[in-house]
């Protein structure tokens, strides 16, 4: 079995042009990765990523170098046999923990390292990641997860029982391997796009077969958002799902006013309406705008915060992201939490590497 011989990092950035990627808060983004490269003694290389908007990617790479040192010389099967314990030891690094804990630069570095471990493991077994995960027993899956700080709501035995309960009907869901799963076009309505460009993009998305799309909102004057959302609704008709994404732009009073005004266009969800750590604000907003669900996740950094959101009924769409959480391992913990409560899971795709194509297949089946 392959043994990790070296750990390298790469600071990858790509500038976006002409308003692409813009939202109400992030006005001039690049797309970037803090990349982990795990080179094995048999020539295989595991690649992991954590997503950024460019600036600061070098900080993640430096944290990867420090956290990754302990993985050199580890055999991949032995490493992954109890990866939950491995991840906890990395997250509790006595020097770097103070910079988090479980959030920020060090947590993004852990995401990149974890994703590289899973990639190397899948390559060593000669299967894609979705197949790797589906081939594991519930007990093997739960050994990949650090359950610390979740014990009062989700024990390992409860997680195993929940996973076993889905196996009886698994064959009914495997049809998705033939048909594929539905997606939505997130590039239709970037915040800095003109009205004309948004309408043209929306119609083109429908012509391409999309039945759902996203529009960026979050203007200081919500009349601007209402006008644009109704414009898109008119362009694509009532049968197309339109999701609205404010990217954390509003304080709670403004979020309530804006979301109530936007309800008339029948959004499929309203995403990141306010500060991403503010569970009580999301709880209040979810009550006020029901039955329209509140979607959060791309900036929810760890399983404990997800526990709080789910306990409070503050989220209607779980958009867990394995490049924001501590990689696939912590993402699995959030998936099981979401299944327990239960709340609908729509993984966030904060990556150009498309890890989530694998994770969506796994979570659906």
Q: Can you annotate each of these PLM segments?
A:
Residues 73, 127, 292, 343, ...:
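Short glycine/serine/threonine/alanine-rich loop segments
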Residues 2-242, 247-256, 260-264:
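N-terminal capping/lid subdomain adjacent to the active-site entrance of alpha/beta enzymes
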Residues 215-351:
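Catalytic core of soluble alpha/beta enzymes
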Residues 2-14, 33, 329, 333-334, ...:
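Flexible C-terminal active-site loop/helix
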């Amino acid at each position: 079995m392959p043994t990790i011989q070296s750990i390298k990092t790469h600071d990858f950035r790509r500038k976006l042009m002409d308003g692409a990627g813009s939202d109400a808060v992030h006005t001039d983004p690049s797309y970037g990765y803090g990349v982990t490269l795990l080179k094995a003694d048999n020539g295989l290389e595991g690649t992991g990523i954590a997503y950024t908007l460019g600036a600061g990617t070098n900080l993640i790479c430096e944290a990867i170098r420090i956290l990754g040192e302990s993985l050199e010389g580890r055999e991949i099967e032995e490493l992954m046999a109890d990866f939950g314990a491995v991840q906890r030891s990395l997250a509790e690094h006595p020097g770097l923990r103070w910079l988090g804990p479980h959030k920020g630069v060090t947590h993004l570095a852990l995401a990149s390292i974890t994703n590289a471990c899973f990639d190397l493991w899948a390559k060593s077994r000669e299967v894609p990641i979705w197949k790797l995960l589906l081939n594991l027993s519930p007990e093997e899956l739960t050994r990949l997860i650090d359950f610390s700080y979740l014990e009062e709501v989700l024990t390992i035995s409860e997680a195993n029982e929940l996973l076993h309960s889905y196996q009886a009907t698994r064959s009914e869901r495997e049809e998705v391997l033939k048909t594929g799963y539905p997606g939505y076009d997130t590039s239709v309505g970037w915040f800095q796009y003109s009205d004309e460009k948004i309408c043209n993009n929306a119609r083109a998305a429908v012509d391409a077969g999309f039945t759902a799309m996203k529009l960026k909102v979050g203007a200081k004057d919500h009349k601007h958002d209402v006008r644009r959302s109704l414009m898109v609704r008119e362009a694509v008709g009532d049968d197309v799902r339109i999701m609205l994404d404010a990217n954390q732009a509003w304080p709670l009073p403004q979020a309530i006013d804006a979301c109530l005004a936007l309800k008339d266009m029948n959004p499929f969800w309203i995403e990141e309406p306010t500060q991403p750590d503010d569970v009580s604000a999301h709880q209040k907003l979810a009550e006020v705008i029901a039955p329209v669900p509140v979607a959060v996740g791309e900036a929810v950094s760890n399983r404990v915060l997800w526990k709080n959101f789910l306990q409070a009924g503050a989220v209607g769409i779980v958009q867990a992201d394995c490049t924001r959480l501590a990689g696939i391992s912590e993402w699995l913990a959030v998936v099981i939490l979401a299944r327990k409560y239960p709340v609908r899971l729509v993984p966030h795709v904060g990556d150009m590497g498309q890890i989530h194509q694998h994770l969506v297949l796994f979570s659906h089946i």
